[in-house]
């Protein structure tokens, strides 16, 4: 005769929640929801306040010469152009510095450089702006003159050259200096997370230090480099004071880097124009802020898409 044993308790039963667990879960849910609520509130405010500005003309808005789109297009171009130039300068430098700190520098030197990078990331933007207008612009102006005289046939180096050095390229260099610490700090942490077994396996197979970095470190950190670059691009897109101090803007569309006729950026234009704006002019400036909001949101969304596409090939899994 056999007896049936009572069924064992379901091992997948949920553990009993304590009051503290429920309180913490509710607090975390509330905090996460507030992020979405804040983002939605900002978007709604920008959309509602932008409608009068988008539909405005030169008849009821003194900042416009024709339509809103003719007004905002040079600003959007200047914002993207300056940020792209800054990113082209900052990313190679940041990756190189991060790689040196994480895999080449002695321990003490790496710690010192890491502290310096972290301190540079905390410097206020107005300090970078003052450095750009008082130190960098006068220093690079002779270089601009030489490039225009000897390589003026190249469209980007066409003249006439600016006599003050306050050009779109100078503003881009200041932006590059500002975003370099951010990109460097993130890339450094990504490189340090490379599995040691991957590095040791590459070296055991006879790879040199550079080959190990190229075959193990870079594939692992590729998505992190993209994320860091997009984060730096977001900082460059929204920078205000440094660009407003350095750039001598005239609100045109031009790819020339060294002339005194430079496109402005949306944040700098808002900062310089808003104190004297009134009526529909305020709505026009808010509408330009909406354009910047959309561009920044699109950049972040693109970064997340790129990271998700490359994640399975990064070696992180």
Where would I find each of the regions flagged by the language model?
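Transmembrane alpha-helical segments of polytopic membrane transport and secretion proteins
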Residues: 1-31, 303-317
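Periplasmic/extracellular loop-to-transmembrane helix junction in inner-membrane transport proteins
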Residues: 9-27, 46-88, 106, 161, ...
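Membrane-interfacial helix termini and adjacent extracytoplasmic/periplasmic loops
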Residues: 56-73, 128-177, 248, 257-258
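Hydrophobic alpha-helical transmembrane segments of multipass integral membrane proteins
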Residues: 73, 77, 81-89, 93, ...
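Transmembrane-helix boundary motif in ABC transporter permease subunits
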Residues: 86-117, 303-312
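Transmembrane alpha-helices
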Residues: 119, 123, 127, 183-190, ...
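C-terminal transmembrane helix and the adjacent membrane-cytosol boundary/short C-terminal tail
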Residues: 188-192, 196, 203, 271-317
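Glycine-rich helix-loop "coupling/hinge" segments at transmembrane-helix boundaries
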Residues: 235-279
């Amino acid at each position: 005769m056999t007896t049936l044993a009572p069924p064992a308790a379901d091992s997948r039963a949920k553990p009993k929640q304590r009051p503290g667990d429920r309180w913490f879960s509710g607090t975390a849910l509330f905090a996460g929801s507030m992020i979405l609520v804040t983002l939605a509130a900002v978007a709604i405010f920008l959309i509602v306040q932008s409608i009068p500005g988008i539909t405005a003309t030169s008849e009821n808005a003194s900042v416009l010469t024709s339509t809103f789109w003719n007004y905002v297009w040079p600003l959007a171009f200047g914002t993207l152009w300056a940020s792209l130039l800054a990113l082209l300068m900052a990313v190679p430098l940041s990756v190189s510095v991060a790689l040196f700190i994480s895999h080449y520098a002695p321990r003490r030197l790496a710690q010192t450089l890491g502290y310096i990078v972290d301190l540079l990331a905390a410097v206020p933007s107005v300090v970078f702006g003052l450095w750009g207008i008082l130190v960098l612009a006068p220093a690079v102006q002779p270089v601009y003159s030489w490039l225009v005289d000897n390589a003026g046939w190249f469209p980007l180096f066409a003249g006439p050259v600016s006599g003050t050095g306050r050009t779109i390229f100078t503003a881009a260099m200041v932006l590059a200096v500002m975003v370099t610490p951010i990109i460097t700090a993130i890339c450094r942490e990504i490189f340090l997370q490379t599995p040691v077994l991957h590095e040791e396996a590459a070296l055991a197979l006879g790879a040199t230090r550079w080959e190990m970095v190229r075959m193990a470190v870079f594939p692992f950190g590729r998505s992190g480099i993209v994320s860091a670059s997009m984060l730096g691009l977001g900082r460059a897109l929204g920078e205000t004071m440094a660009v407003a101090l350095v750039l001598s803007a005239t609100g045109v569309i031009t790819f020339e880097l060294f002339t005194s006729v430079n496109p402005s950026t949306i944040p700098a234009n808002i900062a310089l124009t808003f104190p004297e704006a009134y009526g529909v002019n305020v709505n026009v400036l808010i509408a330009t802020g909406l354009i910047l909001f959309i561009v920044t949101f699109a950049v972040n969304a693109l970064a997340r898409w790129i990271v998700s596409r490359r994640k399975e090939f990064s070696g992180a899994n």
